């Protein structure tokens, strides 16, 4: 395992760490009952009835959990 030759200053450590950022997730758009619905494509989404009650979960066009 590599061992650093010199101590890295607090300022350099924090400057390096500040570059690590979370990327914005890409939302997918879907029209449901005339209204746009945005969801994450890699997650299961809830399918609701006309009253807003949850019927089941769907992922990649299949019923899950």
UniProtKB/Swiss-Prot annotation:
Top-rank taxon, per record: Bacteria
Pfam families (UniProt xref): Ribosomal_L32p (PF01783)
Protein's UniProt keywords contain Ribosomal protein: yes
Family: Belongs to the bacterial ribosomal protein bL32 family.
GO cellular component: large ribosomal subunit
GO terms for MF: structural constituent of ribosome
Entry keyword set: Ribonucleoprotein, Ribosomal protein
BP term (GO), one: translation
Organism (species): Tropheryma whipplei (strain Twist)
Protein name: Large ribosomal subunit protein bL32
Keyword Ribonucleoprotein included in the entry's annotation: yes
């Amino acid at each position: 395992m590599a061992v650093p030759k010199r101590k890295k200053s607090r300022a350099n450590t924090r400057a390096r760490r500040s570059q690590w950022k979370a990327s914005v997730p890409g939302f997918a758009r879907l029209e449901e009952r005339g209204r746009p619905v945005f969801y994450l494509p890699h997650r299961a989404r809830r399918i609701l009835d006309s009253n807003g009650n949850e019927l089941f979960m769907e992922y990649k066009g299949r019923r899950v959990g």
